[in-house]
From Swiss-Prot:
Induction: Expressed in the early phase of the viral replicative cycle.
One cellular component (GO) term of this entry: virion component
Identification of the protein by name: Putative RNA-ligase
Compartment(s): Virion
Lineage: Viruses, Varidnaviria, Bamfordvirae, Nucleocytoviricota, Pokkesviricetes
UniProt keywords, alphabetically: Early protein, Virion
Family (UniProt): Belongs to the asfivirus M448R family.
Length: 448
C-alpha cells in the first residue's frame, strides 16, 4: 500500500479511524492501524481487555502488550503510537507526533498528545533555518517525559494516567527500586508545585493519581527528574511544564504563551537562551563530560555544571515541518543514555540498578567515566572486583563444580576453547571482564 493511501495529519488520522469503525469491527480497524504503523516505521502498543489463551484474564492491573504484526483477538481500549527508529528529514507532521500518542480505541479520539519526536542531526537545512532565526534555543534537562491525561477505565474507574514515549500508562511501572512512576510524580509535585493531588495505593488497582483542579479536556506534558530514574544525584531533582493540549481542538499551548492551561505551581521548561552561532553551541557542550566529572569531584550540586546539550525549537513549524525540534546531545547525555537509560534486558526494578553498575564495571571504556559520575557506587565496584578475582581463579583451575560459579566457569571455558585461545591468566581475565556475562554474574551477586 502506498504512503498516499494514509492520512498525513492527526485530524485526518482520527477521522479515518472513526469512519472505519462505523463500517467494520474493531479488529479490522486495528489491522489497518498496524498497516499504517508498518508503512511509517512506527510501533503500536495495545491495552487489551483479555489475553488469547482460553478464559484467562489479564491481571487486575492492566498490562500493555506490544503488537508486532498480529491482530488483537479481543477488545482494545487504548493504543499508543511511538517511534521504531530515529526521525528522518522528510517525514509528515503526523508521524513526528507519534512519539507516545495515546488514542481511545473505543471512540478514536486523542487521550495524550506528546511533543513531536526530535530530529537529531545538524543538516544543511537545519543550519539554514538556524541562521535565519527560525529556532529558539533551550538547554536540555535530563529527565523523563510524561503526559498526564484523564481516563475512565472500564474495569477500575476514572483516574489520571501517565503516558510515556512507549506506554499508554506507566503509573504502576517501577524503573529502579520499588517506587512507581505515580509515586515519583506525586513526590515531586508535593515538593515543587501547589496543585491539589492525591495518590491512591490499592492492591488491585495499583498506584493512581487524582487531580482536583485539572481540566479533563486537556492533557499535560511534564518533565520529571527523580534520582530513582536519573541517579546522577549531584544534579537536583525537579519537575517542569512542557506543554498542554486541548483534546477537543487539538491545539497545543506552551507555558510561556497566552492561553496556557497548566498544572498549578510548576515552572516552565527552561528559559530561552541567547542565539549563539551554531558552531559555538556545539563547542560549548563538547567539554560537558569533563565539566560534570570535575563538578562532582569538587562536591558541586548546582544544575549549571551539567550540560546535556541544546534543543532547537522552531518558531514556524509549518515551514520547518519534521525538523521543528532538533536535539543536540552533549557527550554527557550520550554517555548517560548508553550506560544507564538503555533497557537492554527484561530485568526487575529491584535488580536494575545492580545490573547497570555491573555492566559499566565490566566495560573498560565505560568503567572509569561511570564511577566518576556516580561515586556513590564505589562499594559495588569493590564487590565486583572480589567476585571477578574468585571467578578468574575458578576458571584457571577449571572448577566447573563450583557451588555458585560453576555455570560461569563452564561458559567462559567453552567460549575460550571455541575461539581456540590458550587458557592462560591474561586470556581468562580478558574474557571474564565482558558485559555479555553480566546476567550470569548477576546470579552470583547474592553471595557477595
Amino acid at each position: 500500500m502506498s504512503n498516499e493511501s494514509f492520512p498525513e495529519t492527526l485530524e485526518n488520522l482520527l477521522s479515518t479511524l472513526q469512519t472505519k469503525q462505523q463500517n467494520a469491527i474493531q479488529s479490522e480497524v486495528i489491522k489497518w492501524l498496524h498497516s499504517f504503523c508498518e508503512t511509517f516505521h512506527l510501533k503500536i502498543h495495545c491495552h487489551k481487555q483479555f489475553i488469547p489463551s482460553g478464559e484467562k484474564k489479564w491481571p487486575k492491573i492492566p498490562t500493555q502488550e506490544t503488537q508486532e504484526n498480529t491482530q488483537p483477538p479481543h477488545h482494545v481500549h487504548r493504543v499508543v503510537l511511538s517511534r521504531a527508529q530515529p526521525l528522518k528529514v522528510q517525514e509528515s507532521l503526523l508521524t513526528t507526533m507519534c512519539n507516545g500518542l495515546v488514542l481511545d480505541a473505543n471512540t478514536w479520539t486523542c487521550l495524550a498528545v506528546p511533543p513531536p519526536a526530535p530530529f537529531q542531526q545538524v543538516t544543511r537545512q537545519v543550519q539554514h533555518y538556524y541562521r535565519n532565526k527560525f529556532y529558539e534555543v533551550a538547554a536540555i534537562q535530563d529527565g523523563t517525559l510524561l503526559t498526564i491525561y484523564y481516563w475512565d477505565d472500564p474495569e477500575h474507574g476514572p483516574s489520571w494516567c501517565l503516558a510515556s514515549t512507549h506506554g499508554y500508562d506507566v503509573s504502576n511501572y517501577c524503573w529502579i527500586g520499588d517506587k512507581t512512576f505515580a509515586e515519583l510524580v506525586y513526590e515531586l509535585l508535593q515538593q515543587h508545585s501547589t496543585c491539589n493531588v492525591t495518590l491512591e495505593k490499592n492492591k488491585t488497582r495499583g498506584t493512581r493519581l487524582f487531580f482536583n483542579e485539572l481540566n479533563r479536556d486537556y492533557c499535560y506534558t511534564i518533565g520529571i527528574r527523580h534520582h530513582n530514574l536519573q541517579p546522577l544525584i549531584h544534579d537536583p531533582q525537579n519537575i517542569w511544564a512542557i506543554q498542554s493540549t486541548n483534546l477537543k481542538t487539538l491545539k497545543t499551548v506552551y507555558p510561556e504563551y497566552y492561553g496556557y492551561v497548566g498544572i498549578p505551581g510548576i515552572q516552565s521548561q527552561v528559559p530561552e537562551l541567547p542565539q549563539f552561532e551554531l558552531p559555538y553551541l556545539i563547542r560549548s557542550y563538547r567539554t560537558a563530560m569533563n565539566q560534570a566529572k570535575n563538578a562532582i569531584k569538587n562536591g558541586k550540586k548546582e544544575k549549571e555544571y551539567f550540560n546535556y546539550g541544546y534543543l532547537l525549537i522552531s518558531r514556524a513549524p509549518a515551514i520547518t515541518k519534521s525538523i521543528s525540534i532538533v536535539l543536540l546531545k552533549s557527550p554527557l547525555l550520550v554517555f548517560l543514555q548508553k550506560s544507564v537509560y538503555q533497557k537492554k534486558y527484561n530485568i526487575s526494578s529491584s535488580l536494575r540498578l545492580e545490573f547497570i553498575i555491573l555492566q559499566n564495571y565490566l566495560m573498560q571504556h565505560f568503567r572509569d567515566n561511570f564511577i566518576a559520575l556516580f561515586p556513590q557506587y564505589i562499594s559495588y565496584y569493590m564487590k565486583y572486583q572480589n567476585m571477578l578475582n574468585m571467578i578468574i581463579h575458578s576458571i584457571a583451575i577449571k572448577d566447573k563444580d563450583h557451588p555458585f560459579a560453576g555455570a560461569v566457569v563452564k561458559k567462559v571455558l567453552e567460549d575460550i576453547e571455541n575461539a581456540e585461545n590458550i587458557i592462560d591468566h591474561t586470556t581468562i581475565q580478558n574474557y571474564a571482564y565482558q558485559s555479555k556475562y553480566a546476567m550470569l554474574y548477576l546470579s552470583i551477586i547474592t553471595h557477595f
